Amino acid sequence: YGLNIDFNYVTSFCDGNITFSINQLFFYTYLDNPLLLQSTTDGLYRLNNITGHTDSKGGETNVKIGYKDFHLYLGYTFTDTGTKENGIRQENILTPKHRLNSILMYEVEDKWKIGLEAYYFSPQKLGDGLKGKQYVVCGFMIEKIWEMFSLYANFENFTDRRQTRFDTIYTGSISNPIFRDIYAPLDGFVMNA
């Protein structure tokens, strides 16, 4: 079962030149006897229904501020998720507790769209019991629109943040690696148009 509730507030200032809206969401989800991937003694993995439960709870705040052709979107998400079995609760892996996002858009209708974005991910628990490192990913996009066609360019992760630059993706030797969880981008900077 689950429950979510959200609240919205919208207003404007300076004779309507500045718009402001905020959305606040709260959520809770509970799964009894969930299906989880578990390692076996022979080094393989198996999907098993556990006898406990998993739950997630948290909140998300989204703010939008507009001024003429500019729009700023700010967001924060808090997620607390864990699995409880035999009276012991453990934090779920690969789920950052804190996530921030920000997007600044400039848009002239039917002419231009330009956007700059940044996303922050807090440290998260990994399958080997260690914590991953925090990281930020940034992007930029631009689109010029004409009557019959448009040109578009997208620069993803232009700061070239890659897990291999700030953390390992395997331990042991290259001939006998033990692979770690992938929790951050591996591709680095990507451009498409």
Residue ranges and their predicted role:
Residues Y9, F13-L35, S39-L126:
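Gram-negative outer-membrane beta-barrel transporters
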Residues G52, I93, K131, A184-P185:
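Aromatic-acidic/polar surface patches that form glycan- and anion
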